[in-house]
Amino acid sequence: TKKVFQSGFVWRVVRQKWPDFEEVFFGFDIDKILLMPDEMLEQKASNPAIIRNFNKVKTIRENALMIDDVRRQHGSFATFVASWPKDDVVGLWEFLKKNGARLGGNTGPYALRMLGIDTFLLSRDVEAYFVEHGLITGSVRSKRSLKTIQDTFLTWQQESGLSFQELSQIVSFSCGDNYVGMAN
């Protein structure tokens, strides 16, 4: 939920209001959230203590439902995510996008990082790297491009022993606005 609200908002504001979010939404207890009727959700969405974006507030219950469905099928959401094949991180992104609410783009990967799952991010600089080096053509988010990007990160990880997060940061700093050059 935090990453859903941070998407498109000033992250500092979300962080400042986060304790109020936790209080308003029962500490994000899935079972309690699932019991909330529509009227209660609407009431909570108008609470000035939180960010009053009803469309994003609705995702709290929608994503709680997704988590509940997964835990019913797999024992727990954490087990499901942790057991996802490490060489198919893009598949996990797709699962979150398809089954969750507002978890597409980089929101899903950011949420996974927050859960301790190693993933790369498709920042503008990472995307630019893959395009500038001719590794992908066309849409960066196409299945073909995502497979190429994932396979490249897997190769780099096997060669370097670094995490996807570390590799993602290195790529980001190697081109675009964040380029960090070497002094002569």
Model-identified regions with their sequence ranges:
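Short, aromatic/basic-rich helix-turn unit that serves as a nucleic-acid recognition element
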Residues: 1-13
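C-terminal accessory module of base-excision DNA glycosylases/AP lyases that mediates lesion recognition
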Residues: 82-184
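Alpha-helical ds-nucleic-acid-binding substructure associated with the helix-hairpin-helix region
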Residues: 26-102
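Short, solvent-exposed positions on alpha-helices
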Residues: 12-13, 58, 165
